[in-house]
Amino acid sequence: MVTAYDATFASIVDAGGVDMILVGDSVATVLQGQRNTLGVSMEQMEYHVQMVAAAKPFALIIGDMPFGSYQASVTDAVTNAVRLIKAGAEIVKLEGGVHVSEQIAAISSIDVPVMGHIGLTPQSYHRMGGNKIQGRTEGKEAGSRERLIEDALAVQEAGACAVVIEGVPSDLATEITGSLDIPSIGIGAGVGCDGQVLVMHDLLGLSPRTFTFAKPFADLRNRATTAIAQYVAEVRSGEWPDAEHSFS
C-alpha cells in the first residue's frame, strides 16, 4: 500500500503494481505543510479521494477518516464513512483500538469495509506527546504491549477487514500479526506484518527529511530541483525555447 492524493500520482502508483492506494490524512503534513494531521477536514479528504478515484486505479482505494470525523459518536462515524465511500473510497480507515470498536462495528454493519490502525496513531499526537514509538512498556496503560494486542483483537472482533500497525517494535508487530485472522499492514513495524505501507513522498525521496523506517527508493527531490534549475538557467540565457519547441 502506498499513499496518493491526486489522479496523477494515483496512476503512477497503480502502474507500479500496488494492491492498495491510501488517500491518507498525511496530506496535512505532506502537501499542506502542517505540523501534524489534526487539521485536515472531511471536505478535504473527500476532495482528495475524488481525485484519486478519477484515475480509475485497479488498486483498492482506502480513504482515511480524519480527526473529529468519527470519535464523538457512532452516528458521526457512519455518516462520514458513507461520505468517503460516495467520494470514491472502497475501504475507510480509522485510528484506535478498543475505544473505537463500536464505531468500526457500526460502519461494518452497513457493508462498508473498515481498516483499523493501531500503535502509533498520528491523530493521538497530543496525548502521545508527539509521534513516539509505542509498545515498549508492560501493563495495561495506553501504548503498552498488552494494550496494543488487546486493541488489535478488538478491531478484528468489531469487523475490520485489515489493520495498520504503526511505530511498534518488530517483535510485537509479528506477535500481533500471528494472533489475527485479518491481514496486518506495517509501517515502522518490521518485516513480520502481512503487508507494508509507505507515504509516497518518502518512498520517492521527495520528502525533505527521511524517517528511520522509510527507505527512499529514489531521489526525486534532488532530481526535480536539478531539472528546475536547468529550466531557469536556459530561460534566462535564451537557450530555451529553441526551434524544436516552437511553432512556425
Where are the language model's segments positioned?
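Alpha/beta enzyme core
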Residues: M1-A218, N222-S248
